[in-house]
Amino acid sequence: MFIFIKHGDNQQFLVNTNCAVVVLLYYIRSKVKLPKTNTIDLCEQTGKMKMLFLMKPNHAEYASKYLTARSTYYVCKVERGPPGTRLENAYRAFVPLLKNPEPWLLVALRIQCDALERRRIQMLKMKEAKKVVIIEPPASVPSKQSGRSDKKKSTRKSPTFRNRPDFRKNKGRQLNKTTKQKK
């Protein structure tokens, strides 16, 4: 299946989606003459980003799973924060690579970029919260012993049973005692 890719001054080309997402993005990047270091993605004509750039590089799923055949997509550059700074991984903007993009398209891309950045910050906060674990001193934590008190008790849990010879011995003693009393 094929899709149409629009870029620049109303230029377009066909792309086969029966390939891995990474291969597709690499091919599109080379067609629009962008360096390998630039991150790109595709957006629909409605302005909805496909977020293909978020997939792992070794992701082997076909692009046809995420893209509709015979549809038109715009190439967008994903702008990140300045390298070497704290905001290096921040999402600054999704810029369509069109000469004169529509204002509504820019607004739709800005809204999606802001939402993605908020999600990224939220994930960072959750990771930080997991790292910070309050450890109480051992004195305040009640220690649970293995169910025994300070008195020494037998470690045996089951009731004591006598074997057969023990019963016979006791019976014999009781009989002897009772017979002696009768006499």
Swiss-Prot record:
Q: Which domain of life is it from?
A: Eukaryota
Query: What's one GO BP annotation on this UniProt entry?
Result: transcription by RNA polymerase II
One GO molecular function term of this record is:
RNA polymerase II cis-regulatory region sequence-specific DNA binding
**Which Pfam families does its entry note?**
Il2rg
Q: List, as start-end ranges, the regions of compositional bias called Basic residues.
A: 170-183
What InterPro entries is this protein classified in? Answer: CXorf65-like (IPR039471)
Q: Where is this region: Disordered?
A: 136-183
What PANTHER family has UniProt attached to this entry? AB2-183, PB1 DOMAIN-CONTAINING PROTEIN
Protein name, UniProt field = Uncharacterized protein CXorf65
Identify the gene encoding this protein: CXorf65
